[in-house]
Amino acid sequence: MAEGKKIGNTLLPSESMKVISESVGISQMSEETCQLLAQEVSFRIKEVTQDALKFMHVGKRQKLTPSDIDAALKLKNVEPIYGFHPKEFLPFRYASGGGRELHFYEEKETDLSDIISTPLPRVPLDVSLKAHWLSIEGVQPAIPENPPPVPKEQQKTEATEPLKVAKPGQEEGLPGKGQGSGEGKGKEKKTAILEGAPLKLKPRSIHELSVEQQLYYKEITEACVGSCEAKRAEALQSIATDPGLYQMLPRFSTFISEGVRVNVVQNNLALLIYLMRMVKALMDNPTLYLEKYLHELIPAVMTCIVSRQLCLRPDVDNHWALRDFAARLIAQICKNFSTTTNNIQSRITKTFTKTWVDDRTPWTTRYGSIAGLAELGPDVVKTLIVPRLTVEGERLRSVLDGPVISNIDKIGADHVQSLLLKHSAPVLVKLRSPPDSPDAYRADYGYLGPTLCTHVLKARAQSALQGPQVNRTTLTVTQPRPTLTLSQPSGSLTPSPRTPSIIKVPSSLTLPVQTLMSARPATPTQPSPPPTKYIVVSSAGSSGTQVLTTSSGPSPSTPGVQPIVKLVSGGQSSGVGGSMTGTGGGMQKYIVVSLPPAGESKTPQPSPPPPTTETSTL
């Protein structure tokens, strides 16, 4: 949402392009064409305006005139716009008399009778003293006595358009506003400077922090670079969420910049990581607008990416993680603050590319440059990294397959190769169509071709596996330990004398509980498995025990299955749906069949007698 507002403030709306095109007879223009045309027109207008401002400054004027615009258009070999040159300067009126020429502001005449007849204002209230809380547990209460926090939109306006936030009398007091007196003062100043008089400069105004803010700044900075991880986490959380850090933002920016400058010289990897985490916390704070401080933050982050050495032992310490983290930070900065006016992303991309293509660049700096380019998006990888895979592969071959010159160079080459394969494979999956052969990749990309082909094949396989899973219903089956309890309904069974059994016979039949949880209410595409059968064999032997055999098929995949209990006797038996007759002397089988709903007509087949290997004695 914030990015949309930012782009809307710097570009002409696409609706204007449609209206202009319709006025010249072009009625059908796509939205994409209008947006591209709006970007181009905005860029040209800004370019002409900047050139006109240069002519204004050369002419030592404080206001932009149509002649400056005409001069800028002539500089671009464009015909100037005619008919907008006034005969007199509009804010001033001209008068002459007594041999003098005067230019003055036209003021409205005020009648004294109107002033006399105006009723007097109300008498102000008497002076009184009132106490209020400045802060409660570190949080400023929202009361009329306390100043409201500076909103992020105002910070952005102050950073991009400082003239809009100037006080009403401040702009008028600037030198050179009046024509009559400005020329004389300008000549006097030039004469005084030429004679060697000291040049008077406007003193800088330094904003002073309160005692509480100074204490907070001291505690936060010490905790962020200290040895206690718990305090560091709390400090970073405070920086990322506190809405009252606007006044301390210049101090934090300077602290990070100076800290990186000192610790890079001392090769202190830990403190550099802590400082980059501070940058991440500042960027995560939604109430801070960092554009006015990018001139200090961007060099600090870029130093952690492309510096030659960040630690004392480059072959052991993991400085590669710091370079990756800083590369992600610089990509986020480009995403949030790059516009067609400042061109932050294009300038950073040019810096990374210039460092990477240099043959004298060490492997650590080369790794950082590639990581920074890769984090800027797949378009940058496609345009800048993929065309140089052949050249970079030959450089890697000379280090990895050649004589070992330095262990540090070999480790750096390994990391560069892994980084190139990691970021190039997803892009090549979209650029190249299958089949992928190592010979074709070797011909196109040289030394990295076969390994790159392997990574592309893995990426295609992963995308093929992940593709069907998007529309596939996920079934999670939770099946606790099965418990079978036998019951004898009254009136359905003929009582018979039974021997004592160790199986307890309650008054209900409990089947295994199966819970099906689906990611969305849809019918699974897999075919339904066959019905589940539970066979319970009960026999009365001389030992006074019963044999219980359970044979289970695949668990049902659809809810709503109604079980049917069928009892079969060893001698003669007849029973359907729970009714049966039998004698106590023969062998009995309890068959529990789980069938699908009534809509599907399937006749379950009786299960064969269970094998002896599945018989367990309870």
Swiss-Prot record:
Belongs to the TAF6 family. Residues 140-189, 476-504, 544-563, 569-618 are annotated as: Disordered. Gene3D superfamilies: Histone, subunit A (1.10.20.10), TAF6, C-terminal HEAT repeat domain (1.25.40.770). The TFIID basal transcription factor complex plays a major role in the initiation of RNA polymerase II (Pol II)-dependent transcription. TFIID recognizes and binds promoters with or without a TATA box via its subunit tbp, a TATA-box-binding protein, and promotes assembly of the pre-initiation complex (PIC). The TFIID complex consists of tbp and TBP-associated factors (TAFs). GO terms for biological process: RNA polymerase II preinitiation complex assembly. Component of the TFIID basal transcription factor complex, composed of TATA-box-binding protein tbp, and a number of TBP-associated factors (TAFs). Component of the TBP-free TAFII-histone acetylase complex (TFTC-HAT). SMART domains: TAF. Residues 476-496 have a biased composition (Polar residues). One of its GO terms (cellular component) is transcription factor TFIID complex. Its main location: nucleus. The lineage of its organism: Eukaryota, Metazoa, Chordata, Craniata, Vertebrata. The gene is taf6. This is Transcription initiation factor TFIID subunit 6.
